[in-house]
Amino acid sequence: MSGKSGWPVVDNLHDNTSEKGSHVVFKRMMQAMGVGGPSVETVLANPNCRPGGYLEGHVQVMGGDHATDIEYVAIGLITRVEVESGDSEYSSDQEFHRQRLTGSFRLDPGARHEIPFRFDVPWETPITEVYGQHLHGMTMGLTTELEVARAVDKSDLDAVAVHPLPAQEQILDALLRLGFRFSRADVERGHVYGVQQQLPFYQEIEFYPPAAYAGGINQLELTFIPTPHTLQVVLEIDKRGGLFTEGHDAFGSFNVDYATADRTDWARELDTWLRQSAQRRGLFF
C-alpha cells in the first residue's frame, strides 16, 4: 500500500511487546531498589528506661504497591563507640543487643501488620540522662530492621533515654555534693581489667574537679559496670604532676550492693579515697 505521494504508508501503531518488556524490567529494578516496597515504623510506649529494665512498644509494617517476601523483623540497641586503632581513633555505631520479632512471612500490597514487643535492656547499657539532662557525648537508639528478600532492607531508628539505677544515682549524687562537675561522657571499645564485663565496650563519665581537689587531680573518670546483683564502680584519676614529678593516672574499683547502697555515706567514702589517691602513687580500694 502506498499513500497519495507514492511513499509507503507507515503504521503509527507501536509494537507494545518490547515496551511492555522494558516496563516490567524497570519495575523489577525499582522494586529491587526498594521503590514502592514496604515501610516500617516503631512506636515506643515510653522511650525512657534503666539498665536491666525493658522497652515496650510495637512495630508497624506497611505493605507497598506489590507483594513482598519478608525474611524477618528485628530490633536492637545501638550506641556510638570510640575505637582506638594504633595511633588513630575513630567512632562507629555499634549494635550491642538484638531481638528478632518475627520469622519469614509474605506481605501483601497495602497490608498493615502490628507487631508488639517487650525488649530487655542489658544491665551494662550506658546511661544517657542524669537529673533530667542529656549526658553530653552520648547517643543511644533502638533500631528496627525489616529484612526484605531480594531487595533493599528497610529500617527505623528511635532515640532512647537510659536513666541511672538508684545505686548509680547514689555515686553520682556523692560526687556532685563534693563539688565535681560533669564534663562529658563517651563509650570506649575494650574491657575494664578486674571486673565482670559482658559487653565489648564500657562507658566513661568525665568530671571536672572542684577547687578542693584541683591541686592534685586534673580529671576524674567514672565507669559503671552493673550486674543483676551488684554495681561495679571503677574510678580513674588523672593526677597532676609536681615540680619534680610527672602526672600519671591512678585507678580504683569497688562494688555497691543494691540492697544496702542507701546505708553508706558515699560522699565521705569517696572524699577519703580521692584525697588518699592524690597523695600516693597508686590507688587500690
Task: Give the residues covered by each predicted segment.
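Short terminal hydrophobic/aromatic SLiMs and anchors at protein ends
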Residues: S2, D15-N16
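Terminal, compositionally biased non-globular sequences in eukaryotic proteins
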Residues: W7, L13, E19-F285
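Extreme N-terminal basic, low-complexity initiation segments
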Residues: S2-P8
